[in-house]
Amino acid sequence: NKSGTVTAVKNGKAVITATVKEHPELSASCNITVMQGANALKKSVSQVMAETSAYMRAKDTNPSVGSEWFVLGLARGGLSLKERYFSTYYNHTANYIEENKGSLTNTTKYTEYSKRILVLTADGKDARNVGGDNLFKYISDRSLVKEQGLNGPIWALLALNCHPEYSFPKNSSAKGQNSEDALVNVLMQSELSGGGWALIGNNHDSDIKGMTLQGLATYSHQA
């Protein structure tokens, strides 16, 4: 019609071309596929959220190490932190850390600590005192965190910024003392030409770029 709205009359494929009236030399075309519209949502968002929460808890009845994304999703989704689900996860995690003398990984995946910090904080707990253990001490050596590639610094920065009182404890044996500024510099210095980041090599990677921007989002006002 005259307002520029295009209405399909049947299913199928078509080509739509738009032209600027005053400048007919300016035009663009796109291919579209017309399909039957999806059914309208019959349930409210809150009802769907409640059903999803119930399903997750039914699938994960005894949350422990390995339940992190369930715990984070339920906590951020609004499930009361007073629910036994969260205390069960915390107790299992604290016991696991104590039994394994603080070890959450036997590789360079120090994101395991950052992930627990994020989840436990969402759970309403203080990651600096998990059964008496400060999880930040395990990611206080920047050189170790960097061994995992960009994911290490990204997740360490996310963990650090998930609570205003968090900080890295002094680590006298560290090859490089970790700090907020140091992590930001690592990410900024890893930026590729054209404004992107890569997990490996020099090819822009949309996934790692998205994660890097999440880590740097706190500092967007400084750009």
Go through each PLM region and give its residues:
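Preference for long, amphipathic alpha-helical scaffolds in soluble/luminal domains
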Residues: M35-A223
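Extracytoplasmic soluble-region selector
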Residues: N1-A40
